[in-house]
Swiss-Prot record:
Covalent S-S links between cysteines: none
Annotated Gene Ontology cellular component terms: cell cortex; cytoskeleton
Stored PROSITE patterns: PROFILIN
Gene3D superfamilies: Dynein light chain 2a, cytoplasmic
InterPro entries per record: PFN (IPR048278), PFN_euk (IPR005455), PFN_sf (IPR036140), Profilin_CS (IPR027310)
Entry keyword annotation includes Coiled coil: no
Entry similarity comment: Belongs to the profilin family.
Pfam families reported in the protein's UniProt record: Profilin
UniProt protein name: Profilin-1
Domain of life: Eukaryota
Known function: Binds to actin and affects the structure of the cytoskeleton. At high concentrations, profilin prevents the polymerization of actin, whereas it enhances it at low concentrations. By binding to PIP2, it inhibits the formation of IP3 and DG.
Length: 134
């Protein structure tokens, strides 16, 4: 299965039981910021934004004072699991980023999708990739 298939058929699929509701954008990136696959709606990001995200995984709390930036959009960092997940909020939407040994999995949502639904979608792919050695 190609990386793009993971994004198109899994990360961007309809939320279970919520026909027509899906993430606003999603991507799978390498730790170096290289794009493995992304939705057409995923924001164009700067390399330093990915560097800062990686630093927060290594040094939890790094992004809290400044916020998380992706594609120039600022997200307020909210509770996450140090070293495993970063969550951010922006208006009625937000972002979930989970890390595997080799990849970062991004899910960006807007209402009516909830933070919990976004977390579940991203976590399912993360767990699968970890099981596959990624």
């Amino acid at each position: 299965m190609s990386w793009q298939t993971y994004v198109d058929d899994h990360l961007m699929a309809d939320i279970e039981g919520q026909q027509g509701h899906h993430l606003a954008a999603a991507a799978i990136l390498g730790h170096d910021g290289s794009v493995w696959a992304q939705s057409s709606t995923f924001p164009k990001f700067k390399p330093e934004e990915i560097t800062n995200i990686m630093k927060d995984f290594d040094e939890p709390g790094h992004l809290a004072p400044t916020g998380l930036f992706l594609g120039g959009a600022k997200y307020m960092v909210i509770q996450g699991e140090p070293g495993a997940v970063i969550r951010g909020k922006k208006g009625s939407g937000g972002i979930t980023i989970k890390k595997t040994n080799q990849a970062l999995i991004f899910g960006i949502y807007e209402e009516p999708v909830t933070p919990g639904q976004c977390n579940m979608v991203v976590e399912k792919i993360r767990d699968y990739l970890v099981d596959q050695g990624y």
